Amino acid sequence: MVVRSLQDLHRSLAQTPLRAESPGSPAGSAPLKLFIRQPFTESGEAQQRLIEQILQIIDTANDPRCPFNYLTGTRAESADTFRESFERDRRQPFTAKNFRDYRLKLLNQADALINIRVGMSESSAFELSYHIFKGQCSPNLFLVWKHAPIKTTLIRDLDDLCEVTYLEFEHADELREGIRDFFHMLSTRRAAAPIPVIHS
């Protein structure tokens, strides 16, 4: 697996064209829709605490010029909580179909997919495959805990299929700079995108 370094992210930033914005320009102000994938069925209390720390670090990169729309919320879940959370938030029974339909509907809106890997998750591979081959195929950020390395060959080195960044970590705080640079790259790119012309 190719692990992107902070230097790689910095080079990507340097290669992204900048566009001067006029005062009051709406460019970059549209919310960035984030789909944050976390393990559920194989996640215990220790993983839940680690996920919570990572979610807090992600939120420190939330820029009012390109605010985050958390499609999947900001709550760290575990095997003991995610079904109850779904039924409470969605007001419908937890079934495989209901949960799958809901998740794929969110994936279809995602401007970026953040995959927090702190444990084994078959569902993560399913959602990632959908995102690449049928969904938005928008940029992916893998946050890979060193105690839960990616062993599945088919989800390693995905650069030829989509834009993907892999960051490995031991402690959540090690991700701070890489997460900040990833979102800075996305917001800079959005600011540089042409503004669509609306004809009256």
Residue ranges and their predicted role:
Residues 1-200:
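Conserved catalytic or regulatory cores that recognize and/or transform ribose-phosphate-containing ligands
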